[in-house]
Amino acid sequence: MRLKTFTFVRWTFSLGTILVLLGAHADAAAISSLASRGYAVLPSPQKVTLGTNDFEFTNAWHLELGQGVKPDDIAVQSLKERLQQRLNLTLSKSTGSAGVVRLAVAGNAVTLGDVRNGNKAALADQAYSLQLTPDRVTITGNTPIGLFYGVQTLVQLLKPESGKLFLPAGEIQDWPDLELRVIYWDDAHHLDHLDVLKEALRNASFYKINAVSLKLEGHFQYEHAKPIVEPYALSPAELQELTDYGLKYHVQLIPYLDGPAHVAFILKHPEYAALREYPDSNYEFCSTNPDTYKLLQGMFDDLLAANKGGKYFVLSTDEPYYVGLANNDQCHEADRAKQLGSVGKMFAEFVTKTASYLHDQGRTVIFWGEYPMKPNDLNALPNYMVNGEVYGPEYDPVFKAQGIRQLLFTSTVGWKEYLFPNYYLLPEAEHLPGPAEGTYEPVHQGPGVVKEMSDFISQSPAWQNANLLGSFIAGWADVGLHPETMWLGYATGSAVAWHRDSPDPRGAMNAFYKLFYGPGGTNIGRMYQLMSEQGQFWKESWEVKATSARTPIWGDWNIIYETPRPSEDQTLPLMPVPSSPLLTLGYDWDVQNSRRLTMAGRFLAQNDELLDLIHTNLEQTKFERYNLELYLSIAQLFRQNLQMLLDLQHISAELKQAEAHAGRAEATEAVAALDRALTLAAGIRNQRNEVLQAATDTWYKSWFPRVAEANGRRFLDKVDDVKDHLPVRTVDMTYLIYRELLYPLDDWATKTVAARNEYAAAHHLAAKSFSLDWGTTGSSRD
């Protein structure tokens, strides 16, 4: 995924440079004129002129279609749909009613202001004007696309108040600063239902997002790569249906396929082992093997045939760590790199071969123009591609001179956020120490991801150094986040790409809360803050250790390990086991975990507040109830972790009680304390299983089941040899509690029962039969 290792360092450096040279937007930036009147619009329009008064909008108003507009146009359909669905309002069919909403298309109706980068004509196609008076609302688009966007703004503007709907008198003229606004939807490790994906496309259009890049990996029924197809996978007809649905709403559905790296989902299969760059690594294709291109071209054909009407294709050339290095019996890249002059030119050759095939099929290819290419390698690239990222002042002017346009790439969530994005950050004092790097590294202080994205997009030197086409907002699901958690970042990040000089990010966040959840929302910002902070503590509340739970890691971005190295997992300090003859404990578990336990108590109280807010908003908000149900399931996962920590503390207390009773020769009481400790352990298991089942039920309302076999197909359960994505560790939803399953509480329980029974026998007390079955995740048992 993007923004890792060298890429992440580069982005961080460039942002720091930006902040120094240009100055970040202050948190106290002036509120927009619309927000000051209680109106929420996202993205914020370019030009707003408001009168002094608001006026009422009712179902007595009627619709009038002007030049260039037909009754079946999507702008007309969308206006009717959204008025009915969001506001329970149907416009009058009587043309004699007092108010009129007039829709029209007129070329050059809106003249763009300062265009700082990009294709002015393409930007003008998306422009619209909105004139608002007490008896007439007129939306005029330069094209049908602009008209559609004007409709979305009108619907967003309608403000419920005291049982009525209001609009501000005035005029809006609006257009985008960047032509293409892509969000990345990650279905690599799960598959959303088709209706969920359709709704995602429609939601995207509401925020003027005009492209969704969908990563499916094995969740598509490839004709030319049948072994990789997973138990649940979109059919070609379904992908075409999804494509057509997006185009209806002026949203491009962009296929996303990795290569040469990040292809363990292909190369793990024995049928494709001969295509590996290194025989013992499934991470990367051999770029000199003709069969690599034959396979990729077949997969391209399958995707293109099911994506007719699409314009773009994301050829994800992400993190090709080892390209040009291999020299073994099945791959001779090193020789070719030497012939070409560098591994960067070797990479450029792979990009050119694959992209030219797609270009010949009529697609504009978005790729990642990055390491190991250097500026003097870029002249080997054709100019018909789009670089999906900016790469800094050393590279961007070279891409520009080469005629290669670029996207401003950033992420609403990366590879270190578990269960929920870092929209808000914990204060420094609330963090627990952790590793200095890697996925379990504690969160660094900062303004939160929305402001980080806003600063990067609005203040990037690429506005001067590159020929910008658009933005790319990624929502990575490497660690298994649900895409529903990413909408705040998708909408606010893309809003800055539409209007670079948008008001401050906090204002955009508040506008999103109003628009996404509708009227009746209570302290939504606080709910997101608590979700973010609880997610950070969920990750940091466990320690990190080397693991044998999966095969070792073959290499990293800058090295091939001579001997593969263990990956990492999370754990907690082990519970002490009583020893004979007096149930002696070797150490004080509470002391080892003092700060962890203190903070768990505080976060449990905050979890109470979070659950109250989610339940309140489930009762009161009008829209996105499933989103809130999902947040409830995540909040319960947070809570289960907190309660487990505190229950382990209670177990520790019972062990101490047993030791104390044994020291006073109170055998009956000592055994009873041990029995209570074992009962607490069983309670942790039961609660964990109940929360997992509830989360699974909720997530499967929008996902197909993660299973080993279905529809005559089997999932090949093998991990990536270089990357360690948490959902790949399990076939099912148990990745949500994976670290708990690895925690050796079963071993502790077995040894504690043995110690208990040995002590009981010595004091003529009954033995106890007990099996914790810690790894069992089925129905809870008494």
Feature roles, as predicted:
Residues 98, 102, 220-229, 373-377:
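Beta-rich nucleic-acid/ligand-interaction surfaces
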Residues 2-13:
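Bacterial N-terminal signal peptides that target proteins for export
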Residues 29-178:
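Contiguous, structured surface segment used for ligand recognition
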Residues 107-109, 260-261, 318-322, 371-374, ...:
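Short, internal active-site loops enriched in acidic
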Residues 24-28:
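Sec/Tat signal peptide C-region and signal peptidase I cleavage site
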Residues 177-367, 388, 398:
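Substrate-binding cleft of carbohydrate-active enzyme catalytic domains
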Residues 11-22:
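Bacterial N-terminal signal peptides
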Residues 35, 41-44, 49-51, 59, ...:
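Substrate-binding groove of N-acetylhexosamine-processing glycoside hydrolases
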